[in-house]
Amino acid sequence: MSLLTEVETPIRNEWGCRCNDSSDPLVVAASIIGILHLILWILDRLFFKCIYRLFKHGLKRGPSTEGVPESMREEYRKEQQNAVDADDSHFVNIELE
């Protein structure tokens, strides 16, 4: 006899569960965990690009400027811009004949 016929049997043209222990706290906890797992799996599949991009890059938004005077912030911005400008000068033009 299969497990299916032992647990679920036709009752009045419907399928019902003959488990008398369905109010057991372990069964209730397992059901809740199963439902939560299914919900999390569906959300993961729907939003996996956003979720893993967040994990990969984190919440990095640059160094904190809290408590730093405005003049030093401006100096830092200029240094960063100069570094970007210096990198732009490294490109080499190659002409093919």
Curated annotation (Swiss-Prot):
Localisation per UniProt entry: Virion membrane; Host apical cell membrane
Chain ranges passing through the membrane: 23-43
Topological domain ranges for the Virion surface compartment: 1-22
Residues in compartment: Intravirion: 44-97
Region (Disordered) residue spans: 59-84
Signal peptide (UniProt feature, chain positions): none
Any single Pfam family the record assigns to this protein: Flu_M2
Biased composition (Basic and acidic residues): 71-80
Phosphoserine found at: 64
Homology family: Belongs to the influenza viruses matrix protein M2 family.
Note: When the channel is activated, one or more imidazole moieties of His-37 probably become bi-protonated.
Role this protein plays: Forms a proton-selective ion channel that is necessary for the efficient release of the viral genome during virus entry. After attaching to the cell surface, the virion enters the cell by endocytosis. Acidification of the endosome triggers M2 ion channel activity.
Protein name, entry field: Matrix protein 2
Species this protein is from: Influenza A virus (strain A/USSR/90/1977 H1N1)
